[in-house]
């Protein structure tokens, strides 16, 4: 009886010992197992300010069999694939957050490695579209805001926009918030569909607060996608910034928008 209990206890003990494949480095039960990890080799460092609208990152995993995916500003941009670098273009002004994650063939995943960085590619006073780029499908509507960037004592703005009606339609053009802080303002749109263009004239009519400074939205446009392709929405012709006494303000840069329709 004692022998039976002895062998039974040995049997129960051995059943509790975790089993693993000695030759499998991906088995988490293996004492030699190393969890997946990723290291970013190149790209902006934490909180760096970059002065271009594009950025490149490269990374490496702790095992050559790994696949990777990456994120920008909380959005998955590329799912699991055999990639180790990326060039991100058409970045908007301001703060961004890049992240990359690795995975073993067994689907064990690493922690996501993040880098925060800032884009300051546009020197004001300038006109620019936000966002710079929309990815869309046929029939979808997307919204662009037209910003006055880093202006001082701006009282009026006039700009002309060109686009391709074969690829997109302009569904609406409305006033932004920048001049709405004044008691009175005007917002006039001259749209010529035959010329694939429209012109906006907007101004403050308030004698108490005749101008604004900083960065803000002059206009908002809603665009509907007609067909596949890349559509450039550009500033053209005479574009003007004016101060309180109708003084001309130089526009240093004019940056349009892009719609890529699939």
Which residues fall in each region the model found?
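Acidic, low-complexity intrinsically disordered segments
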Residues: 16-18, 120-262
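Sec-dependent signal peptide recognition
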Residues: 2-7
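C-terminal motif of bacterial Sec signal peptides marking the signal peptidase cleavage site
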Residues: 11-14
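Low-complexity, disordered linker/stalk regions enriched in Pro/Thr/Ser/Gly
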Residues: 16-125
């Amino acid at each position: 009886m004692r022998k039976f209990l002895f062998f039974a206890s040995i049997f129960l003990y051995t059943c509790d010992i975790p089993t693993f494949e000695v030759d499998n480095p991906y088995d988490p039960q293996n004492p030699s197992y190393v969890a997946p990890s990723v290291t970013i080799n190149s790209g902006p460092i934490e909180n760096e300010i970059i002065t271009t609208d594009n950025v490149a990152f490269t990374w490496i995993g702790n095992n050559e069999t790994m696949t990777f995916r990456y994120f920008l500003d909380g959005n998955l941009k590329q799912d699991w694939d055999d990639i180790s670098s990326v060039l991100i273009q058409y970045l908007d002004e301001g703060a961004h957050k890049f992240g990359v994650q690795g995975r073993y063939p067994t689907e064990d995943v690493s922690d996501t490695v993040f880098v925060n960085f800032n884009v300051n590619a546009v020197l004001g006073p300038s006109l620019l579209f936000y966002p710079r780029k929309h990815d869309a499908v046929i029939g979808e509507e997307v919204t662009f805001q037209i910003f006055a960037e880093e202006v001082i004592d701006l009282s009026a703005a006039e700009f002309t926009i060109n686009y391709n009606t074969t690829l997109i339609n302009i569904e609406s053009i409305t006033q932004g918030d920048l001049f709405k802080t004044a008691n009175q303002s005007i917002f006039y749109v001259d749209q010529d569909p035959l010329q694939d263009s429209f012109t906006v004239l907007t101004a403050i009519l308030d004698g108490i607060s005749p101008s604004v400074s900083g960065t803000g939205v002059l206009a908002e446009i809603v665009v509907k996608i007609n067909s596949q392709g890349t559509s450039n929405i550009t500033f053209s012709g005479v574009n003007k910034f004016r101060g309180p006494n109708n003084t001309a303000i130089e526009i240093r840069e004019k940056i349009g928008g892009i719609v890529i329709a699939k």
